[in-house]
């Protein structure tokens, strides 16, 4: 026993104050007594002082690791992971980079604006804007032309009124509608080409108004025709039975919709597609309307200022490279014009499709406010044209694309026909006000058909979106320079050459 006690004491000397966790009796009891005497010296005569509880295991481990200096997990500081810019990392928060892009864009444009002011001074002249609409203050051909459009609106109404009561046959009504709609296209064009006092800008506004009226009245004619066809089918099915109208007390049915009030509401409503019962908002929100009106005024002034201060000098400086056929300078002028042209186009989009159309819709309590969709996310040319101008897109689908399919055309022919109609109106709104026919706008629109195929075939995702943006940023300045160059040569350079 003495040997075992000596061995135990020597073991205690080697391990220091480390607590033994072995159980047992005999010599082990002596070790426990020695340990308790060392740890609890205050156990005295009374023996009633509580012994301190042993430290928890995790605390002892932590103390041991601190004293050693290196823990088990501190030996490893690397793990399997990808860099943030790698597609496999799953990281998507690039808000700081987006803010950096915005800051750089602001600084770059601020430098260009300062350079423009230093080079040209202040070119903004509100009085000059009036001269773009009127040559003679006593001759207002464009406003008079727009007022005269009421003749064709009334003619359409009278034709439909007589068709509803059977005073005209469908064939005669179709003939009268075709003549009326053709006159809507040809009459303002003839006035714009023959009347010398009308300005290009005034002619543009008049032709745009007549184009909108053409689309609206063609939709008005189609919907009323469909209502007559449905009425004939309903009579054949019901065999003269009257349908209860209790469920439709607040709706208008054909031919009760044939009133001047209904037609002129449609003429002023921000849509090209006619319905007998439009969705209506419950009230006019005055604050919303005031914001839209202020936006209209602000962005109108901003567009005029940017055109006069930024675009006009750039276009004027581009004429000499075009005359000399200096291709490097032409490309430089083209890229320089691309920035202000694209910025003005974006402002125009917001001004027209958000501010103006929402203001008109709020005044008329027109409920359908989907005037545009997320065209800026377009990954194809087709998606862009389907989403940037919803009123025109709805009209094309309803009154052009689907009727062509019903007549037996395939989808490719119908889609090409839609682009052809769009190309016609683009050329119509540009060539006639400028009084020259170069077909640049028509060619640019028809080029969208092969361009859409190329983008769909070779570009996907973000690359497709980038391709759409490139066509928007570069394509429009090319058309602008083409028309401005030809207009300049036709009106200013020809006498010098002669």
UniProtKB/Swiss-Prot annotation:
Residues covered by region (Involved in homomerization): 1-96
Domain of life: Eukaryota
Lumenal side: 128-139, 194-200, 320-326, 432-439, 493-498
Region Intracellular loop 1 (IL1), residue ranges: 235-287
Site description Important for catalytic activity, residues in chain: 427
Sequence segments annotated as region (MBOAT fold): 140-498
Transmembrane annotation, as ranges: 93-127, 140-165, 171-193, 201-232, 285-319, 327-364, 411-431, 440-458, 461-492
Chain residues that bind an acyl-CoA: 385-393, 401, 415, 488
Catalytic activity: an acyl-CoA + a 1,2-diacyl-sn-glycerol = a triacyl-sn-glycerol + CoA; all-trans-retinol + an acyl-CoA = an all-trans-retinyl ester + CoA; 2-(9Z-octadecenoyl)-glycerol + (9Z)-octadecenoyl-CoA = 1,2-di-(9Z-octadecenoyl)-sn-glycerol + CoA; 1,2-di-(9Z-octadecenoyl)-sn-glycerol + (9Z)-octadecenoyl-CoA = 1,2,3-tri-(9Z-octadecenoyl)-glycerol + CoA
Chain positions covered by the region annotation Amphipathic helix (AH): 391-405
One MF annotation (Gene Ontology) recorded for this entry: acyltransferase activity
Entry annotation: catalytic residues: 426
Pfam families from the UniProt entry: MBOAT
CC per GO annotation: endoplasmic reticulum membrane; intracellular membrane-bounded organelle; membrane
Pathway(s) the chain acts in: Lipid metabolism; glycerolipid metabolism
Residue stretches of biased makeup (Basic and acidic residues): 58-68
Intracellular loop 2 (IL2), as annotated region: 365-410
Region named Extracellular loop 1 (EL1): 128-139
Keywords per UniProt: Acyltransferase, Endoplasmic reticulum, Lipid metabolism, Membrane, Phosphoprotein, Transferase, Transmembrane, Transmembrane helix
Coiled coil feature spans: none
The protein's role, per its UniProt record: Catalyzes the terminal and only committed step in triacylglycerol synthesis by using diacylglycerol and fatty acyl CoA as substrates. Highly expressed in epithelial cells of the small intestine and its activity is essential for the absorption of dietary fats. In liver, plays a role in esterifying exogenous fatty acids to glycerol, and is required to synthesize fat for storage. Also present in female mammary glands, where it produces fat in the milk. May be involved in VLDL (very low density lipoprotein) assembly. In contrast to DGAT2 it is not essential for survival.
UniProt remark on domains: The disordered N-terminal region is required for the diacylglycerol O-acyltransferase activity and may regulate enzymatic function via its interaction with the MBOAT fold. The MBOAT fold forms a reaction chamber in the endoplasmic reticulum membrane that encloses the active sites. The reaction chamber has a tunnel to the cytosolic side and its entrance recognizes the hydrophilic CoA motif of an acyl-CoA molecule. The chamber has separate entrances for each of the two substrates, acyl-CoA and 1,2-diacyl-sn-glycerol.
Similarity comment: family membership: Belongs to the membrane-bound acyltransferase family. Sterol o-acyltransferase subfamily.
Self-association state and partner proteins as the record states: Homodimer or homotetramer; both forms have similar enzymatic activities.
Protein name: Diacylglycerol O-acyltransferase 1
Organism: Rattus norvegicus (Rat)
């Amino acid at each position: 026993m003495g040997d075992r006690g000596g061995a135990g004491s020597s073991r205690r000397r080697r391990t220091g104050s480390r607590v033994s966790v072995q159980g047992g009796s005999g010599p082990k009891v002596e070790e426990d007594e020695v340990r308790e005497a060392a740890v609890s010296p205050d156990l005295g005569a009374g023996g009633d002082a509580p012994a301190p509880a042993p430290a928890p295991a995790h605390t002892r481990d932590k103390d041991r690791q601190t004293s050693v200096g290196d823990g088990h997990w501190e030996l490893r500081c690397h793990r399997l992971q990808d860099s943030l810019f790698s597609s496999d990392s799953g990281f998507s928060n690039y808000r700081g980079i987006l803010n950096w892009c915005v800051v750089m864009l602001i600084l770059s444009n601020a430098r260009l604006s300062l350079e423009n002011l230093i080079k040209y001074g202040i070119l903004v002249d509100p009085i000059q804007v009036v001269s773009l609409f009127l040559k003679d203050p006593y001759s207002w051909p464009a406003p008079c032309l727009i007022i005269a459009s009421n003749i064709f609106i009334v003619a359409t109404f009278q034709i439909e009124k007589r068709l509803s009561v059977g005073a005209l046959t469908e064939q005669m009504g179709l003939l009268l509608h075709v003549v009326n709609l053709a006159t809507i296209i040809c009459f303002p064009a003839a006035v714009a080409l023959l009347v010398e006092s009308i300005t290009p800008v005034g002619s543009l506004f008049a032709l745009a108004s007549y184009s909108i009226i053409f689309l609206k009245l063609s939709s008005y004619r189609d919907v009323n025709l469909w209502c007559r066809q449905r009425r004939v089918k309903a009579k054949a099915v019901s065999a003269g039975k009257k349908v209860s109208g209790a469920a439709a007390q607040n709706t208008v049915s054909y031919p009760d919709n044939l009133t001047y009030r209904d037609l002129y509401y449609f003429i002023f409503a921000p849509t090209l597609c006619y319905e007998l019962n439009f969705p209506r908002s419950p009230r006019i929100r005055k604050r919303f309307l005031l914001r839209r009106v202020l936006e209209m005024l602000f962005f109108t002034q901003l567009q005029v200022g940017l055109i006069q201060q930024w675009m006009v000098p750039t276009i004027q400086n581009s004429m000499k490279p075009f005359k000399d056929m200096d291709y490097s300078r032409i490309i430089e002028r083209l890229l320089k014009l691309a920035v202000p042209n694209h910025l003005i186009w974006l402002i125009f989009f917001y001004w027209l499709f958000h501010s103006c159309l929402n203001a008109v819709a709020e005044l008329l309590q027109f409920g359908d406010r989907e005037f545009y969709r997320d065209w800026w996310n377009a990954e194809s040319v087709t998606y862009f044209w389907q989403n940037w101008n919803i009123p025109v897109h709805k009209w094309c689908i309803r009154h052009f694309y689907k009727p062509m399919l019903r007549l037996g055309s395939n989808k490719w022919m119908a889609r090409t026909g839609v682009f052809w109609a769009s190309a016609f109106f683009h050329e119509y709104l540009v060539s006639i006000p400028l009084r020259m026919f170069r077909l640049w706008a028509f060619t640019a629109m028809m080029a969208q058909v092969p361009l859409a195929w190329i983008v769909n075939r070779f570009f996907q995702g973000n690359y497709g979106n980038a391709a759409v943006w490139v066509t928007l940023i570069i394509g429009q300045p090319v058309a602008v320079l083409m028309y401005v160059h030809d207009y300049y040569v036709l009106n200013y350079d020809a006498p010098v050459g002669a």
